[in-house]
Amino acid sequence: MSTPKFRPLKFGVTRVNMREGTSGVRYMLADQPLEDFATRMTDRLVHWATTKPDATMLAKRVKNADGSLGDWRHISYAQAWQSARAIAQALIDRGLNAERPVVIMSENDLEHALLSVGCLVAGVPFCAASPAYSTISQDFEKLRHILTTLTPGLVFAADAKRYGKAIEAAVGKDIEVVLHSGEITGRATTPFESLLATPATPAVDAAMQATGPDTIAKFLFTSGSTKLPKAVINTQRMWCANQQQMAQSMPVLAETPPVLVDWLPWNHTFGGNHNFGMVLYHGGTL
């Protein structure tokens, strides 16, 4: 029987200070202060695209026509930054903002990731809607609720075949639909590649610099287990501060860039904030 291999890990925060409040409330505070953190998550993307441009940020196995898995498709930090700038310009050209954000109707995917960072660069909030609301639901009630709540200016879906029915049922004709693959009969759509082909201008840099700690990065919706899902605003400060908390609690993240095999859905805070953010913040690979 082989001996299990263990890796020694250093934990940064192991103790807390507690004080008694009123009405039985107790307050706990880590025994070390929170250090300075990035102003915006895109600062980290720029940092890694500059310091290690060829390192893999994202990777996915290509699915062959017969359903088997082929080679890995890699996207480096430099490529992600270039793609994010192009997408950001496309979003700026469309006048999207917090009142007209981006809704993503797709599972975790490379295009989903690139669109997300493009939104961050442009300062346009995005929302990853639970794929189940589009692929399992028969009445699309929760999807309609998300669209009504956010009033998006653009909706993205990776696959027309998988998401076409939900788009036809819930997405208004006045909302631009961007598809990575396929077409929807009788409806004009925009290919995702056209966003990637948009030439970036100085407006992209200006838009990113205009974002700050209180800029809305994304909307996450609660699970809707008992009632309709509720939109939760996630600001740049919230996301960056949380990543710094994680970095101080788990110093190993700064010692070795994390490599994650990820399946947790990005419409949930664990997958979309914890894991995706951890990789981006520390120059890892997802």
Tell me the role of every PLM-derived stretch.
Residues 15-29, 44-76, 217:
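AMP-dependent adenylate-forming
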Residues 33, 57-117, 134-142, 192-200, ...:
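Conserved AMP-binding/adenylate-forming core of the ANL superfamily
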Residues 53-56, 180, 186-221, 227-228, ...:
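Conserved pre-ATP/AMP-binding loop-to-beta segment of ANL
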Residues 88, 109-134, 145-154, 258-259, ...:
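A short helix-loop-beta submotif of the ANL/AMP-binding
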Residues 106, 175-185:
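Short beta-strand elements of ligand-binding domains
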Residues 106-110, 130, 263-269:
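Conserved AMP-binding
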Residues 133-168, 199-201, 242-261:
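Conserved ATP-dependent adenylate/AMP-binding module captured primarily in the ANL superfamily
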Residues 240-259, 266-286:
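Conserved AMP-binding/adenylation subdomain of ANL enzymes
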